[in-house]
Amino acid sequence: MSSAPNGRKKRPSRSTRSSIFQISKPPLQSGDWERRGSGSESAHKTQRALDDCKMLVQEFNTQVALYRELVISIGDVSVSCPSLRAEMHKTRTKGCEMARQAHQKLAAISGPEDGEIHPEICRLYIQLQCCLEMYTTEMLKSICLLGSLQFHRKGKEPGGGTKSLDCKIEESAETPALEDSSSSPVDSQQHSWQVSTDIENTERDMREMKNLLSKLRETMPLPLKNQDDSSLLNLTPYPLVRRRKRRFFGLCCLISS
């Protein structure tokens, strides 16, 4: 370096300093880029699947509420029997399909047996279980109501036996809305066959939903299996950690003093 006239040394130029103190970051390898890209893409897919499953469970919850309103309407004066049963069949079929899809999606995003569990997944398990329990209960209600009305209708048929005039007057005043007293015997037989078919279909769907509920409880995460119903409503906001099942070999003896 050359000295300045006043005795000070010259500082290196900007270009020289940049060349001397140049700090370059090592370029990312292709594997690093792939790992970063695959990680973010996997997280995005998981979140999207979680949102889809959440929306599906909410729609199934709405469908269960609609079916419950239809079951309550059985026997209402303003509701026609054929149209009500057709609407119940349509709503019940759609609800069963939603329940199957929700169970499949929830089982797919649940993950392996060990590891962290997202709290939202736990809540979806609880919501789906409650909806399925209510769904099967409402199906059982509809079976009982339709069966009782059909039994009441058979008792009023000509072959059902003779009744006193007072009983006939009382029954005519208490005739359910689903019954058409002016129908012919052929119409009565057809109506009875249709109601029996609806009851059989409802029983079939109820058995299917009960089996689905059993599968849901079997595939439920371990933290949910190990907790009671009261603690399920107060889940921690932090990810839950699955615990391995402890296996005990041999016998456990109790010794009393």
Curated annotation (Swiss-Prot):
GO terms for biological process: G protein-coupled receptor signaling pathway; negative regulation of signal transduction; regulation of postsynaptic membrane potential. GO terms for cellular component: axon; cytoplasm; dendritic shaft; dendritic spine head; glutamatergic synapse; neuron projection; nucleus; perikaryon. It comes from the Eukaryota. InterPro entries: RGS7BP/RGS9BP (IPR026512). It is found in: Nucleus; Cytoplasm; Cell membrane. Residues 1-45, 174-196 are annotated as: Disordered. Residues 32-45 have a biased composition (Basic and acidic residues). Palmitoylated. Undergoes rapid palmitoylation turnover. De novo and turnover palmitoylation are both mediated by ZDHHC2. Palmitoylation regulates the cell membrane and nuclear shuttling and the regulation of GPCR signaling. Upon depalmitoylation, it is targeted from the plasma membrane into the nucleus. GPCR signaling inhibits depalmitoylation and promotes localization to the plasma membrane. Keywords: Cell membrane, Cytoplasm, Lipoprotein, Membrane, Nucleus, Palmitate, Signal transduction inhibitor. It is a lipid-anchor. The keyword rRNA processing does not apply. This is Regulator of G-protein signaling 7-binding protein. Belongs to the RGS7BP/RGS9BP family. Residues 180-192 have a biased composition (Low complexity). The lineage of its organism: Eukaryota, Metazoa, Chordata, Craniata, Vertebrata. Regulator of G protein-coupled receptor (GPCR) signaling. Regulatory subunit of the R7-Gbeta5 complexes that acts by controlling the subcellular location of the R7-Gbeta5 complexes. When palmitoylated, it targets the R7-Gbeta5 complexes to the plasma membrane, leading to inhibit G protein alpha subunits. When it is unpalmitoylated, the R7-Gbeta5 complexes undergo a nuclear/cytoplasmic shuttling. May also act by controlling the proteolytic stability of R7 proteins, probably by protecting them from degradation. A lipid is attached at C252, C253 (S-palmitoyl cysteine). The nuclear localization signal is both required for nuclear localization and palmitoylation. Interacts with 'R7' family proteins RGS6, RGS7, RGS9 and RGS11. Component of some R7-Gbeta5 complex composed of some R7 protein (RGS6, RGS7, RGS9 or RGS11), Gbeta5 (GNB5) and RGS7BP. A motif (Nuclear localization signal) lies at residues 242-247.
